[in-house]
């Protein structure tokens, strides 16, 4: 993965190299579109440049689709401090300004343009070791273009669809059906191009055919569910049906080589070898974190990989900014919050999740494995953060949190266990969270398989891992609960409740939940902010966010603003 990072920096420079005119038309001094890419090494740099877009967005995670998917869902609030209006606005489907998502828009379209370049040029490169190698790389470009468009379409709905580097001028916003048709088409191309081989340890961080099959199911389920369709017509006139997607997800589940990790707790960083025996919850449990000492998670099918080379320069995105945002707010003594490390307090967990989970599955070990019950686990925790915490609750997310560890000599704690495990020379908690952010996990594949086939096989495999009894008959409610518990805080809940058309009911439960404001008991009352959760969801036609006003202005009015964002949507603060 370190190699991928270095290549990415080269790729960025090369992709945007300027082209000058010489009397001799042969360019001997620089690479540009007339002579790049040509070789296998060039092709590898181009692909690295597309993946690098994941890190670029990670540098500003508060604007990302992943953060939106967490904070806008019914299982979290916005949180953060009184000046972190962006976080609270996402939760409320409001806006702190006119360009709240512009950086994400710009960054993802840069990634799409790199993917367009790869799709157009990699077939002409020489030096591939095999046809499979060439097809694998082109397939990865199709996957990443689809993934980036999936995020943009889910977030904004009405977006320009640019699939060629030759596009000039302003491309109008596409009909959503056209955008989703292209997403599904790209994933189909990725499935057909990439060989039936699981990503090797040496290529960890790259996607494979099976990740494309999983992403196909995710995209198909959202499009057909949210828009109430049964199939989708592709740009070439062919159709992808539910049966087609079942065939792909069956192949993924049966032949991919990915598997469920036997103990659910081993998926999360608090089970690392430096922390587990000092944490009461994990002590003596014979746990082994799947990523200990750079090991590869056998359940992870697509993840953002990080490295210890993050810095305050252009490489800040090499550290896990999402973990930092979800960390414990307030610079509290690490001994009082152990093993959970410092951060900005985004996404406090709604008390309703703990209550619903306890009522539905009182014996489910995943609840305590996923959610920190602060009064029970952290009795020395201090409410209020820097006396500015908004929407604080008694619950934190364990899965994505920074994790600290005790120092072996003397008193004290490492801010993150990675500082010790990977021998950091300079320590900074803002740059040293480097555990993966998993975007597609094999458990999700099994649950999507059950949903598509309306059977209990995948559900029961997931339940068995957690020590729960099997269910005898498939039902939508059983499937929906299983996804909520198994995949909590993994960026899928928001699109799930939207595509199932239960968002209004789910979001309404957030009203009047117990929270704290600046350390004092409060209620989550939101009706003064656009009428509240349900009103805003309805006004925005199902939870779509605003097109950045600067992009509308730059388009000369070609782009039109999304419904529900015309006026009166400015969030100025909690109180």
Predicted regions and their residues:
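Short linear capping/connector segments at secondary-structure termini
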Residues: 28-32, 92-96, 161-169
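Glycine- and aromatic-rich loop/turn segments at beta-sheet edges
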Residues: 157-165, 193-202, 259-266, 472
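Long, intrinsically disordered, low-complexity segments
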Residues: 18-20, 108-111, 222, 272-330, ...
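Short coil/turn linking the two alpha-helices of tandem helical-hairpin repeats
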Residues: 151-155, 160, 198, 219-231
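Bacterial Sec-dependent N-terminal signal peptides
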Residues: 3-6, 13-41, 183, 217, ...
């Amino acid at each position: 993965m370190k190699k991928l990072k270095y290549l990415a920096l080269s790729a960025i420079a090369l992709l945007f190299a300027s082209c000058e005119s010489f009397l001799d038309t042969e360019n001997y001094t620089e690479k540009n579109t007339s002579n790049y890419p040509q070789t296998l090494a060039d092709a590898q740099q181009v692909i690295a440049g597309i993946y690098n877009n994941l890190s670029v967005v990670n540098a500003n995670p508060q604007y990302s689709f992943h953060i939106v998917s967490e904070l806008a869902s019914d299982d979290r609030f916005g949180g953060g401090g009184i000046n972190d209006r962006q976080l609270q606005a996402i939760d409320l489907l409001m806006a702190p300004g006119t360009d709240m998502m512009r950086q994400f828009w710009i960054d993802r379209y840069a990634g799409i343009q790199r993917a367009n370049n790869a799709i157009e040029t990699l077939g002409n490169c020489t030096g591939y070791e095999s046809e499979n190698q060439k097809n694998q790389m082109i397939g990865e470009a199709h996957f990443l273009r689809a993934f980036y468009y999936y995020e943009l379409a889910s977030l904004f709905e009405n977006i320009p669809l640019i699939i060629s580097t030759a596009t000039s001028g302003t491309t109008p916003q596409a009909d959503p059906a056209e955008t989703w048709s292209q997403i599904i088409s790209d994933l189909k191309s990725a499935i057909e191009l990439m060989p039936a081989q699981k990503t090797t340890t040496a290529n960890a961080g790259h996607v494979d055919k099976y990740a494309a099959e999983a992403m196909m199911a995710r995209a198909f389920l959202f499009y057909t569910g949210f828009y109430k369709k049964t199939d989708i017509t592709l740009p070439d006139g062919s159709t992808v049906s539910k049966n087609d997607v079942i065939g792909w997800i069956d192949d993924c589940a049966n032949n991919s080589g990915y598997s469920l990790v036997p103990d659910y707790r081993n998926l999360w960083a608090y089970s690392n070898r430096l922390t587990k025996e000092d944490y009461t919850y994990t002590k003596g449990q014979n746990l082994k974190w799947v990523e200990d000492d750079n090991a590869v998670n056998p359940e992870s099918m697509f993840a953002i990989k990080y490295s210890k080379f993050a810095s305050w320069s252009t490489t800040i995105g090499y550290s896990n900014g999402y973990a930092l945002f979800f960390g414990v707010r307030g610079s509290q003594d690490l001994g009082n919050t152990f093993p959970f490390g410092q951060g900005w307090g985004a996404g406090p967990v709604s008390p309703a999740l703990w209550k619903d989970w306890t009522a539905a599955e009182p014996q489910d070990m995943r609840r305590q494995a996923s959610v920190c019950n602060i009064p029970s686990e952290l009795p020395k925790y201090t409410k209020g953060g820097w006396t500015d915490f908004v929407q604080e609750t008694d619950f934190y997310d364990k899965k994505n949190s920074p994790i600290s560890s005790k120092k072996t000599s003397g008193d004290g704690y490492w801010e993150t266990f990675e500082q010790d495990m990977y021998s950091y020379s300079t320590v900074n908690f803002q740059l040293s969270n480097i555990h993966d952010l998993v975007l597609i996990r094999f458990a999700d594949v099994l649950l999507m398989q059950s949903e598509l086939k309306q059977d209990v096989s995948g559900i029961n495999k997931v339940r068995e891992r957690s020590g729960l009894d099997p269910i005898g008959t498939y039902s939508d409610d059983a499937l929906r609960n299983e996804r909520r518990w198994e995949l909590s805080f993994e960026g899928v809940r928001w699109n799930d409740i939207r595509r199932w058309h239960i968002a209004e009911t789910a979001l309404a439960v957030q009203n009047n939940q117990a929270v704290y404001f600046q350390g004092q008991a409060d209620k989550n009352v939101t009706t003064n902010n656009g009428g509240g959760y349900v009103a805003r969801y309805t006004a925005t036609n199902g939870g779509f966010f605003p097109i950045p006003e600067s992009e509308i202005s730059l388009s000369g009015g070609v782009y039109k603003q999304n419904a529900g964002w015309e006026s009166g949507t400015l969030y100025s603060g909690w109180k």
